[in-house]
Amino acid sequence: MNVQVSPDSLVIAGKTYGSRLLTGTGKFKDLEETRLATEAAGAQIVTVAIRRTNIGQNPGEPNLLDVLPPERFTILPNTAGCYTAEDAVRTCRLARELLDGHNLTKLEVLGDQKSLYPDVVQTLKAAEQLVKDGFEVMVYTSDDPILAKRLEEIGCAAVMPLAAPIGSGLGIQNKYNLLQIIEDAKVPIIVDAGVGTASDAAIAMELGCDGVLMNTAIAGARHPVLMASAMRKAVEAGREAFLAGRIPRKRYASASSPIDGLIG
């Protein structure tokens, strides 16, 4: 039986995407593995750490855009490694120059090197400035529903709460906060950080997240390209399960076969 599923696209800053899996480009062994994993993931949006990855600022060095060309992928520059609003804003402006006026950016302002938790005060400050400067801001933040709403009200194009600390692989630690963020949001909510395996991605999507962004879960796997393929399927399955609607949880059994018309 061929079940027809209605078109279900992710829309960010007015642009439509068929894939809800966003991937990072760091930690792979080389650019070829980056390309293969990105293609296996089916990702259309790929995020790039401007302070760590060459996209043209270092002529003569391998350029990520040679394997992930902007004609095929939406390049999402990020401010990884920034610890102040000023550094983050400066990095975004550099990225816009390198990408010929590209305004979509991923903002992250970190609090310290141990936890890599977001510094929410600096994040709010940077988000306000970037929105004023005409950027379409996708913002990495904590799983605080009040803060998520504030970032939406500032004008961020997407809010990206963490599932767990960056690179930890712990999976979603607070489903209830995520649910509240999702229920209150009028912009896409994309889980960012902490995903460890395919089931984590599926759970995020089943909760109603609009997408999942990951890097370490794929790049750090024993077989990154295979894991990328698994993550693609998990995100798709989780989204379909969310749209289908899970059955209610009950304390007691409920027979799956009707009792009417029993013989004997």
Curated annotation (Swiss-Prot):
Gene Ontology CC terms, in alphabetical order:
cytoplasm
Q: Which residues does the record give as 1-deoxy-D-xylulose 5-phosphate binding sites?
A: G167, A193, G194, N215, T216
Q: Give the pathway annotation.
A: Cofactor biosynthesis; thiamine diphosphate biosynthesis
Give the catalytic activity.
[ThiS sulfur-carrier protein]-C-terminal-Gly-aminoethanethioate + 2-iminoacetate + 1-deoxy-D-xylulose 5-phosphate = [ThiS sulfur-carrier protein]-C-terminal Gly-Gly + 2-[(2R,5Z)-2-carboxy-4-methylthiazol-5(2H)-ylidene]ethyl phosphate + 2 H2O + H(+)
Q: Which Gene3D superfamilies does the UniProt record give? A: Aldolase class I
Q: Name one GO molecular function term.
A: thiazole synthase activity
Q: What does this protein do?
A: Catalyzes the rearrangement of 1-deoxy-D-xylulose 5-phosphate (DXP) to produce the thiazole phosphate moiety of thiamine. Sulfur is provided by the thiocarboxylate moiety of the carrier protein ThiS. In vitro, sulfur can be provided by H(2)S.
Family designation? Belongs to the ThiG family.
- Its name, as the record gives it, is Thiazole synthase
Q: Which organism is it from?
A: Stenotrophomonas maltophilia (strain R551-3)
**What does UniProt list as this organism's lineage?**
Bacteria, Pseudomonadati, Pseudomonadota, Gammaproteobacteria, Lysobacterales
Gene of origin? thiG
